[in-house]
């Protein structure tokens, strides 16, 4: 801020006017600074997220380091979702994405839902679980009631249920959206052929070998065509983009029409 010279009336003529004007100036500049530095590229937030899992066992810590790096520390979600939005993350796992979104914008209201009670307990009782205000719910996505939200997220979670239940879950999610809300689905695209093989292999490794993720049925991945049909049937706009260039990971953004 430039030095204010004696007699300068830029910020008012009285001490009261100057005090109020300068307060507004610092608030405005602080918000600008937060917009620049409260992003996933800031090493502070990356380190804070990973350190949240260092006393939860070597496998979980290693998994988080790899997973968060592969997911770009959730920069796509941070830039997509407004900083005052209400968010429900269905299939939150250990809530790493929710913690990042909450750290970057504390004014967000976030609900983290997962079927695995163990993961919910680990997340709830972690440092960030107590610090960020993320609200945890343990339950099956097919039966649990979703909170009213601006954004409902399904990140690599829909493929744990069959096609019929996928449709039912998404329909219930639509009913839980606030006006102008969005459903964001990130999952492997079954129609991508060879590129989809990597996703299937990693899920096999995760569910059958390491038993890191719980599943009671065979995996069922949606396709781009399936998602487009669903959007048309429910009068929603849809945006589709490739999430990770090395596999079939695809981002589907379903928007309610006003």
Predicted feature locations:
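Conserved SAM-binding strand-loop segment of SAM-dependent methyltransferases
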Residues: 130-141
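A short glycine-rich, Lys/Arg-flanked "PGG" loop and its adjoining helix->strand segment in the class I
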Residues: 167-179
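Class I SAM-dependent methyltransferase SAM/SAH-binding core
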Residues: 96, 100-132
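N-terminal, positively charged/glycine-rich alpha-helical extensions of SAM-dependent methyltransferases
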Residues: 2-57
